[in-house]
Amino acid sequence: MTPLQNVQHFRSNAIKTERHRQGVKFLSFTRRYGTLVIFVLLVAAAAYISTDFLTLRNVMNLLRQASTTIIMAIGMLFVVLTRGIDLSIGSVLAVGGVIAALLAPEWGLPASIAVALVAGLICGLACGTLIAYLRLPPFVITLAMMTVARGSAFILTGGQPIMLNDAASGLSAFAGGYIGPVPYPVLLMAAIVLLGTFVLMFTSFGRLVKAIGSNEEAVRLSGIRTQRYIVAVYVISGFMAALAGVLITGRTGVGAPNVGVGFELQVIAAVVIGGASLMGGRGDALNTVLGALILAIIGNIMNLSNVPGYTQQVIMGAVIVAAVILQKIQNQKMS
Amino acid sequence: MTDFVQLIGIEKHFGGIAALKSVDFTVKSGEVHALIGENGAGKSTLMGVLSGNVIPTAGTISVEGCVRRFSTPGDAIAAGIAMIHQELVLAPDLTVAENIFMNRMPRLIDWAKLRRDAAQILDRLGFEIDPGATIGDLPLAQRQIVEIAKALSLNARLIIFDEPTAVLGPSDARRLLNLIRSLRSEGVAIVYISHRLDEVADIADRVTVLNDGSLIATRAAKDVTIEEMVRLMVGRPISALFGEKRTSPFGAEIFRVESLTAGPLVQDLSFGVRAGEIVGLGGLIGSGRTETARAIFGADKRESGRIFIDGSQVKIRDPRDAVKAGIGLVPEDRRGQGVVIDASIRINTTMTSLRRFSPAGIIKRTFERRFVGEKIAALKVKSAGIDAPVQSLSGGNQQKVVIGKWVDVASKVIILDEPTRGVDVGAKSEIYAIIRRLADEGRAVLLISSDHQELFGLCDRVLVMGRGRIRSELLPGEFDEERLLSASLAIEPIQTTVRTDQNPAG
């Protein structure tokens, strides 16, 4: 090489590295904010398709509908971070909902809600204990809990939906009420999301949950009783599901044993679209919220533009696949 | 003889790290070409390139004069190149015959024919192995023969042996070497990777030495002595790597294990380690060293045994108890057990001591960052910063992170299981210095290593394990590779009681 060529060679190399660096920056941006980008694009598309979309009323309505999904998705996120899965949440939701409706007339609202939430905790505790200490597969155990809890909801109600009576009017008021333009359940959801974000970002619990999902053995050999953390995430998930059940009972005025069938799949879809890895260790609360909102907005757009229900299901499935493929591509480029 | 395979100018980069730097390597038909070098020298990567497992960043491969491109192991096999892996890659639940013909089973299986064909190949090798036996039921030596049979049935014309005798007893090893000789006389080209230099001197026609990814030399085996091979491999006199041994007396016996039993590979072990002392656990792979470490640490269940720290018994049911008692373990499998590979240096370093940084469960980030920053500076971890994922570090630096997470927590005892496996020479000597410092600060250090130079260079005493028992104890004057191996292979216990009363000066 002549000196001149040498310099040119050096320059072109320098340019290449600079481009490479920018490429990496761009990719880490999309990895971090990829879900946000999709979300913003969707909002823009929705606003374009329907002038009703960006009205305060529609937005608040959308958020209220999504709030139960989001609450459960935060619980599911913790489970997924440990490389687990919780298929029981749709049924646990029903258990929570019917218990609140059943007990409210006699026990009063606070006690009945407390019992409903404790029931959710117990379902999670049962799953978590079996999974963590007997090393049974989460898929199978929570699948079993799904049918056990569903059956229990039917047994508790004798198969009939339980109407909320006047003693529980406070619950209906809460689930249907507003502070200014913001529905109460949306505020509750926001508080839970903030709490989830905080726990995952700033506490040792959150850090260890993620680390366990990446490499449980390394965490265990660091002197941490990993089983306790695994039990805890299922307890959280069960609690969130029961809470969602109470809210739904409040909103509909009925504790129905058949409510929430298939919700677990919707919630898992939200978590996955939010960028969490089902292989554990990766995911965060805010992106999970975006994942749930993306699903909700697509549903909302299709409703506003009169897409028939069955077609909606097909489109939803396609969206999930697209989201996962997108993430896969991003991850490959990253490594 | 002509070159069967020529590798020219092979380079391989993993991330920013060069694992191979412009390496040339040729193998002739009918020769045994030994490839030697320290762990991490690039032997496995080079053989990965030759067997299609690793795609080189640059360089050409030619087989019988034609340039080939191997993008999968299948391509290499099609070119007549087979590799006998260190961890044998046979399906344990299938039969010998099924394994041999694994990748070309007919759609409709004629079982009788399959077994006949398998028996024929095994006969050619001179081994009587039942083609209908299940692989999982065979001893390791026979499984290796099955691997070789599989390679031959694929018409392999070059076979790569990766540390084939590491897991074999002496008589099986001798039979294997004879088998390799007869393959050579049939015109098969053979690449032989081994740490046992006496075997290399015995069997090889040519020797190639790699160090730190570079080709150091290729010589005719008869022109090079074992001492010379060592010097070429290490690149400097061995003794310089390990630093000075302690000359001052040790402290009290702060760590003691009494009648530890856990499964077949940990049988009634008793020994002690004094403050400031580095005690080695030597022996063959499978002699129970790792199992002993895990049983002490509470990582695996144990049947019986007591553990004493500072003279008082501690109850260890799980790793958490061990950590509380001041014991740390640097596990054998770094990626699988030592680090959370995709988490940052910071997260890995404070994993053992997270409570210190999160009094109310909320992590004090500033405190944590300062701590980790100081730690990785002291351990000379080369990285892009404390938030870099451990994945981005070289093996040696990853290992420093694993040791780093124990420095403060393992205040009494630190157990290191193969701490320099897959680590380059530079990082090795740094890790040795760290281990010395851990001992000098008054800890009891238990070092497990299959690298005998390392055991002898670092340890004040070596306990030799064989089949789950302590077979012998070697003092510095008795540090001798042959002695260690023969003790580990002994069937009857030579010595089950262990001396602890002598002084290091003696």
Curated annotation (Swiss-Prot), chain B:
It is found in: Cell inner membrane. GO terms for cellular component: plasma membrane. Its main location: membrane. GO terms for molecular function: ABC-type D-ribose transporter activity; ATP binding; ATP hydrolysis activity. InterPro entries: AAA+_ATPase, ABC_carbohydrate_import_ATPase, ABC_transporter-like_ATP-bd, ABC_transporter-like_CS, P-loop_NTPase. PROSITE patterns: ABC_TRANSPORTER_1, ABC_TRANSPORTER_2, RBSA. It comes from the Bacteria. It catalyses: D-ribose(out) + ATP + H2O = D-ribose(in) + ADP + phosphate + H(+). ATP binds at G37, E38, N39, G40, A41, G42, K43, S44. It is a peripheral membrane protein. The keyword Protease does not apply. Keywords: ATP-binding, Cell inner membrane, Cell membrane, Membrane, Nucleotide-binding, Repeat, Sugar transport, Translocase, Transport. Residues 5-237, 249-492 form the ABC transporter domain. Its EC number is 7.5.2.7. PANTHER family: CARBOHYDRATE TRANSPORT ATP-BINDING PROTEIN MG119-RELATED (PTHR43790), D-ALLOSE IMPORT ATP-BINDING PROTEIN ALSA-RELATED (PTHR43790:SF3). Belongs to the ABC transporter superfamily. Ribose importer (TC 3.A.1.2.1) family. The complex is composed of an ATP-binding protein (RbsA), two transmembrane proteins (RbsC) and a solute-binding protein (RbsB). Part of the ABC transporter complex RbsABC involved in ribose import. Responsible for energy coupling to the transport system. This is Ribose import ATP-binding protein RbsA.
